[in-house]
Structure formats: C-alpha cells, structure tokens
C-alpha cells in the first residue's frame, strides 16, 4: 500500500511544483520521507490574515489516498477551525463516511479524488471564512461571533508574529 501512496504523493508534488497555487508552497520535508510535507501558506488577501506567512506540516498515512493526511500549523494561530495546538479542523481532512456530529455531509469529507492542492486551497478558504458552527478553538469561535473587531486585532498580532515582527 505504501508504494501506491508514494507514487501518488510524488505525482502530486510534481504537479504542485509545475503549477503551484498562488500563495502556497508545499513539498516533502526531505527526499527520504515523502510522507511528511511542509507547507507555507500566505494569508488570503483582504482578510485579517493578509500578509501572514504560516508554516504547517502535512502527515500522510501509508494508505494515502484512501485515508486523509493530518495537518498542523507549526506557528501560533488563533482561528475557530484550528485547535490551540495547531491541528486543522476542516471537512476535507475528516475520514470518509457520515459525520457523527451531523455538521458535514459525506461529500464534504475526504475521498481519494481529493489532493494536497485541494486541501491547501480549502485551508486558505477556511482562513478567509471561518466556520464557527464546529469550532476547534472555542475562544476564537466565540470571539469571531461576538467581537469581530477584537478577533481582527488578535489575527493581526498573529500575522506580525508570523513575520517575526
């Protein structure tokens, strides 16, 4: 199974290298291990995360693409759909099948036709438009709902930290 996963990851890396999505850089951390990738995601334009540069790690299972990777930001993040430890909570990264909580349709969840590029683009969209109905960070979700101005201030501080300011 790992051979199939490796071939798929190599093909996806080649595609990302030849035609990278705007504002995203991603690839294996080293040539010996194609199952751990690092990514740099630029904050989406016209959002409170604009100008930020956010590093993340994608960890792929040996049965990829049957199972989704896990994604974790390695910098400080404050967002309704990112756990305090950096783990990303987004439908496309959830295993196939029905959502026991009833928030997601099976079509929104992982399937083998998804790709690293689709994951990263979904995360950029998530940064721009948080889903506060299934919050991974309760404090960020509450602030997003109740005090948007304060949320923007905190996000701007995160952006400055991401730039080393």
Curated annotation (Swiss-Prot):
Subcellular location: Endoplasmic reticulum; Lipid droplet
Keyword Glycosyltransferase: no
Keyword annotations: Acetylation, ATP-binding, Endoplasmic reticulum, Lipid droplet, Nucleotide-binding, Transferase, Ubl conjugation pathway
GO biological process: ERAD pathway; protein K48-linked ubiquitination; protein polyubiquitination; ubiquitin-dependent protein catabolic process
Modification N-acetylalanine occurs at: 2
Listed InterPro entries: Ub_conjugating_enzyme, UBQ-conjugat_E2_core, UBQ-conjugating_AS, UBQ-conjugating_enzyme/RWD
Pathway: Protein modification; protein ubiquitination
Residues at the catalytic site: 89
Record flagged with keyword Cytoplasm: no
Top-rank lineage group of the source organism: Eukaryota
A matching Pfam family: UQ_con
Known EC number: 2.3.2.23
Domain UBC core: 4-164
Reaction catalysed by this enzyme: S-ubiquitinyl-[E1 ubiquitin-activating enzyme]-L-cysteine + [E2 ubiquitin-conjugating enzyme]-L-cysteine = [E1 ubiquitin-activating enzyme]-L-cysteine + S-ubiquitinyl-[E2 ubiquitin-conjugating enzyme]-L-cysteine
GO molecular function: ATP binding; ubiquitin conjugating enzyme activity; ubiquitin-protein transferase activity
GO cellular component: cytosol; endoplasmic reticulum; lipid droplet
Role played: Accepts ubiquitin from the E1 complex and catalyzes its covalent attachment to other proteins. In vitro catalyzes 'Lys-48'-linked polyubiquitination. Involved in endoplasmic reticulum-associated degradation (ERAD). Required for sterol-induced ubiquitination of 3-hydroxy-3-methylglutaryl coenzyme A reductase and its subsequent proteasomal degradation.
Family per record: Belongs to the ubiquitin-conjugating enzyme family.
Subunit structure: Interacts with AUP1 (via C-terminus); the interaction recruits UBE2G2 to lipid droplets. Interacts with ubiquitin ligases AMFR/gp78 and RNF139/TRC8; recruitment to lipid droplets by AUP1 facilitates interaction of UBE2G2 with AMFR and RNF139, leading to sterol-induced ubiquitination of 3-hydroxy-3-methylglutaryl coenzyme A reductase and its subsequent proteasomal degradation.
Name of protein: Ubiquitin-conjugating enzyme E2 G2
Origin species: Bos taurus
């Amino acid at each position: 199974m790992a051979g199939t996963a490796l071939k798929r990851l190599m093909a996806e890396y080649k595609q990302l290298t030849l035609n990278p999505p705007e504002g995203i850089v991603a690839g294996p951390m080293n040539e010996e291990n194609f199952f751990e990738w690092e990514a740099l995601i630029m904050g989406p334009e016209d959002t409170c995360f604009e100008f930020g540069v956010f590093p993340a790690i994608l960890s792929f299972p040996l049965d990829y693409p049957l199972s989704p990777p896990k994604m974790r930001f390695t910098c400080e993040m404050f967002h309704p759909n990112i756990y305090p430890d950096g783990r990303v909570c987004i439908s496309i990264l959830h295993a196939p099948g029905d959502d026991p909580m009833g928030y997601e349709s099976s079509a929104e969840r992982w399937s083998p036709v998804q790709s690293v590029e689709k994951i990263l683009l979904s995360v950029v969209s998530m940064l721009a438009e948080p889903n506060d109905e299934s919050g991974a960070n309760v404090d960020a979700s509450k602030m997003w709902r109740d005090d948007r101005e304060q949320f923007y201030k905190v996000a701007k501080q995160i952006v400055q930290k991401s730039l080393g300011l």
